Amino acid sequence: ETYDWLGKLDPTRLVVDNSACETPTTPNFHVATDLADFHVYFLAPDNAIRWRNQIADFAKRARWMWSPHGDTVESGDEPLILSEFGSWGLPRLDRLIADTGHEPWWFTTGRHYYRPSGIQRRFAASGLDRIWPTIDDLAEATQWHQFESMQYEIGQLRRHDSITGYVVTELTDAYWEANGLLDPMRGPKAYHDRLPALLSPDAIHADLRQRDFYGGDDLTAEVSLAGYGPPSTGGEVRWSLEVGGAVALEGRLGIDAWPEQGTIALDSLTIPIPQVDAVADAHLRLTATEADGRVRASDELRLAILPATARRTAAPLRVAIHDPLDIWGIGVRLSEMGHEIVDADSADLIVASELTDAIVNRMDAGGRALILVRSRGAIPENHDLARRVGIHLRRLAHSGWPGQRSPWEGDWVSSWSWILPKEFAGLPERNPLDFAYEAVLPDHVLLGHDPERHRQEVTAGMFVGWVHTPAALIWEFLQGRGSVTLTTFRVAPES
């Protein structure tokens, strides 16, 4: 009734009955509307697959956008608009305090993990200065993480010809809500110079299923071209793969005709990854031009390349496996890496998918164990470990935040994962962890550590929002005369 009333009041305007979104407690939908819009929030790269799948569903005019009660009035041609999405990139503190010399008044607003006050103290107490020299270095790193998340999400939106528009949340940070393209002072974020290409009416997109490679692998990508400019016959996409700052390979894809309004698929792209001697940064660059050479769209994706020799260990161990359900294929994976699978009495290391009393006893007697925490039951609640370790599924609500999602989920208030570079010299140095780590980013976090007292024990972790709720992703500590390493990284079988 309100939709009809407002449409008659001003027939020149589009009317949206309810800008719909899915929430944990109050799912909502459209009944009658001129725009079929929806809000979707997923953290990328952590939940990139969930984003990809939901956007693909949305592009098909999914029924979950509409009332399930049989009372909808649909024409079937309401434009599909993703009217809210985005992620966080913290502002530089030096810019916020430049005029007054102290924290802004709104730092004491916001609740829990989105309350800014005390961020510098938490930064120091969490040991994050081992990764980023200053809080402003951390802030800029989260901004680049925000950009790569938006780049992926916008790329997925523009792959689908049926989706006619999107609205990034938001133009500027709104006080503590740090998902703006600009900071609260209307200043640029670190990626500002990349925004024209990202938000251009014309866009070139390479859809990669992975961004981490070994030398000798093949990079494959589905390439699409979106256009909302003047018609043009012909053109090409020029691509190059740069490794360590130098062009290693380059080539071209033909464009028969530019789309005038929408998206077309081009030929797929296959690029052989060159061999490297050490882990290397790489960039895939694409430029789409008209036949006369005028550039209309460009894009750049950051990749990581590891030496082919890194597939196998340089220090093989005798490893005992405890994986009762054999879900993760741990033994096969370790054998492929060059380790010898033996019984527990002969092992240098026990690798297990769950902790048992027998494993604890072996560690107490001097043994070492690696526990791959892939479920909440991997460590029994009554365990006899030297640290009181808790496991939490990131997508599951937590009792400490009643009525809210788990803070570590990261879909609305971003969570960021990190590793200590000096502890993992053979891995890409990407903090916060980016798409090079997508396949192993964890579903669970480890709780119970004290960031100050246990700082040297935690070599990978996660924080949320304004540097709150620290959690461990790799936690190693002494157990009796031996030691245990716990990790929630999904190191088998996906990777």
Enumerate the language-model features and the residues they cover:
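Extracellular ligand-binding/catalytic regions of CAZymes and related secreted enzymes
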Residues: 180-182, 186, 237, 297, ...
